[in-house]
């Protein structure tokens, strides 16, 4: 893992370089896209970005949990949670990149 975190500013910079919008317009575009995704999720809609992922909101019912320290049963309130499900295309890209890095790190074993 590289440890790098991609930020909104990084996305805006990429739009600036690849699309040719001004830096301000690029930042506004990134903000607009993120706002639209967030608004749809808040409304309870699924957001499906083909070849990337699906974001969904799920309602979870009340259930009984357990305090790991004491073993005491504790009710867990009903709540809404957001899920992220990567597409198969994205999963394959991640796997391919992982295998490629792994093969580069493996030392060659010369016969002899």
From Swiss-Prot:
<comment type="subunit">
    <text>Heterodimer of an alpha and a beta chain.</text>
</comment>
<protein>
    <recommendedName>
        <fullName>Integration host factor subunit alpha</fullName>
    </recommendedName>
</protein>
<dbReference type="GO" id="GO:0006310">
    <property type="term" value="P:DNA recombination"/>
</dbReference>
<dbReference type="GO" id="GO:0006355">
    <property type="term" value="P:regulation of DNA-templated transcription"/>
</dbReference>
<dbReference type="InterPro" id="IPR000119">
    <property type="entry name" value="Hist_DNA-bd"/>
</dbReference>
<dbReference type="GO" id="GO:0005829">
    <property type="term" value="C:cytosol"/>
</dbReference>
<comment type="function">
    <text>This protein is one of the two subunits of integration host factor, a specific DNA-binding protein that functions in genetic recombination as well as in transcriptional and translational control.</text>
</comment>
<dbReference type="InterPro" id="IPR010992">
    <property type="entry name" value="IHF-like_DNA-bd_dom_sf"/>
</dbReference>
<keyword id="KW-0238">DNA-binding</keyword>
<keyword id="KW-0810">Translation regulation</keyword>
<dbReference type="GO" id="GO:0003677">
    <property type="term" value="F:DNA binding"/>
</dbReference>
<dbReference type="GO" id="GO:0006417">
    <property type="term" value="P:regulation of translation"/>
</dbReference>
<keyword id="KW-0804">Transcription</keyword>
<comment type="similarity">
    <text>Belongs to the bacterial histone-like protein family.</text>
</comment>
<keyword id="KW-0233">DNA recombination</keyword>
<dbReference type="InterPro" id="IPR005684">
    <property type="entry name" value="IHF_alpha"/>
</dbReference>
<dbReference type="InterPro" id="IPR020816">
    <property type="entry name" value="Histone-like_DNA-bd_CS"/>
</dbReference>
<dbReference type="GO" id="GO:0030527">
    <property type="term" value="F:structural constituent of chromatin"/>
</dbReference>
<dbReference type="GO" id="GO:0009893">
    <property type="term" value="P:positive regulation of metabolic process"/>
</dbReference>
<keyword id="KW-0805">Transcription regulation</keyword>
<dbReference type="Pfam" id="PF00216">
    <property type="entry name" value="Bac_DNA_binding"/>
</dbReference>
């Amino acid at each position: 893992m590289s440890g790098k975190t991609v930020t909104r500013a990084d996305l805006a910079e990429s739009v600036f370089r690849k699309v040719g919008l001004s830096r301000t317009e690029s930042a506004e575009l990134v903000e607009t896209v993120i706002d639209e995704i967030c608004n749809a999720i808040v409304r309870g809609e699924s957001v499906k970005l083909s070849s990337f992922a699906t974001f969904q909101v799920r309602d979870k019912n009340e259930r009984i949990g357990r305090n790991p320290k004491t073993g005491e049963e504790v009710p867990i309130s009903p709540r809404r949670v957001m899920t992220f499900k990567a597409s198969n295309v994205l999963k394959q890209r991640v796997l391919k990149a992982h295998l490629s890095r792994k093969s580069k790190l493996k030392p060659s074993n010369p016969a002899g």
